[in-house]
Amino acid sequence: MKRSIGINIIFMLAALLMVTFAGVYYLTHQAKDFPFRCSAFSRYDLSRNDDKRIEFAVAQDLRFDQKDSGYLLLNGQATSNDGVTILNRRVALINGAKISDDTYQYQISKVVTSNTDTTPDVIFNKLLAEITLDPTHLQLDVDKIDKNTYIIGGPISYLYTCQRY
């Protein structure tokens, strides 16, 4: 009788120890979601034919500062039939939520145009339409592919690979 009680106590302590170690392992190996900062350089060719050339060469800096706010910096140049212009804008994000395991959705509160930006809004809006869900929301898939490397996907396709910093 005493022996079976001792064995039961040993099994209970072993099970408690295993659950404790599993919990500690789980908590220490979870990815830290916020803040999320990731940058990359991308080239977008949105030309529909040779007569209507629209290309962007931009550095993108995506920052989810907190669960409910962040921004996307777009710096570079836009090339159209009218020539080459400078693109320097910040897309401010609010009311964010993690809507699935790897998908974030934010409301676009405003697009801030720098004094150095010379790209017409009609050209910029074509790029914005390529990377956003609609003119008022940004929805991105953030898939980890390496220790600090992520692939960022938009509503239509993957957009770019970036390095988290």
Listing of model-derived features with the role each one plays in the protein:
Residues 38-42, 55, 89-91, 99-101, ...:
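Extended beta-sheet lipid-handling architectures
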Residues 4-25:
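Hydrophobic membrane-insertion alpha-helices, especially the h-region
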